[in-house]
Amino acid sequence: MVARGNVVSIGQIAPKHSSEVSFSVDPVSWEIGSLLQRGMLLEVATSNKPGLVCPQSNGCHEDMSLMTFMVSSSVIFPALVMCTQAGRDHEGDLPLLLPVVRGIGAPYEKELFAATKGVNTQKGALFSAAILAGAAGYLSQKSRHFQIGELFEVVAAMTKGIVRRELNPSVLEKKESLSNGEKLYLRHQVPGIRGELERGLPSVRDYAVPALKYAQDLGASLEASFLHTLITLMSQVDDTNIISRGGLESLKKVKTLSKEVLKEGSIFNKEGIDNYFYLENFCIDRGLSPGGSADLLAITISAYLLSEEKFKCKIM
């Protein structure tokens, strides 16, 4: 890997089997890509997440651990840098940037599965982060400093019409194989991450980012801030991972329990913590893993860092 301050050819960091690319990476792209990877790493490093992989537990997962996530996060980092650079170089309409970043991300999805020996740790996170990287890169053409609302507006513009194009039943019925998200859309009409992105990530914009800012203003630690933000997301997100594992009734119950935790003061007082333990045990006992909310937590942390640039508490 080259020093961050250098301008390098994409060919130096692209997977061997990827197509030849003709642009170079500048220092701003390294910086933004690093912040996106940091969001992924901080999400998985957060302890006591219900049903999710974290430092002291594999949650409801038997095929992955913290180590698996460390491997996949490092493997996909170059894609985040290159997607940022693609945004910085983009001159056309914003919807035309989407196939560019997806084309960059596709070979890294294969690299991810190769590195984890077939375990899907961050396929969805890569999809979201690649789009966020392209959006951040596009905004950084004018200035490295931009408002978080601008970031979500560009994401919405990039992904306009993605649900109609990719989740239309007439389109899905012609495909030989469907992803879990596509199957759930046919069954329950839940648009998943595509719906979130097309609407400018409303769960992140309207709930998670304010929750993270609130926790930081309160003086909470990083872990407490991230856990509070995750609970906030779980109270709002139609998490396809939960639906896939437990159906719509489980999703409804998880959202209700998460709202009760927040109502009692979240994890910032005894009543809220007691309610949180109940939520955590509910997820563990039923094998529920809110992976969609976890991916959005990573996006929230990255978006916060891209706009606020630093946390108010100690990094520990």
UniProtKB/Swiss-Prot annotation:
Signal peptide feature range: none
UniProt KW Amino-acid biosynthesis keyword: no
GO biological process assignments: prosthetic group biosynthetic process
Keywords, ordered alphabetically: ATP-binding, Nucleotide-binding, Transferase
InterPro entries: CitG
Domain of life of the organism encoding this protein: Bacteria
GO molecular function: ATP binding; triphosphoribosyl-dephospho-CoA synthase activity
Family statement drawn from the similarity comment of this UniProt entry: Belongs to the CitG/MdcB family.
Protein name: Probable 2-(5''-triphosphoribosyl)-3'-dephosphocoenzyme-A synthase
Gene name as annotated: mdcB
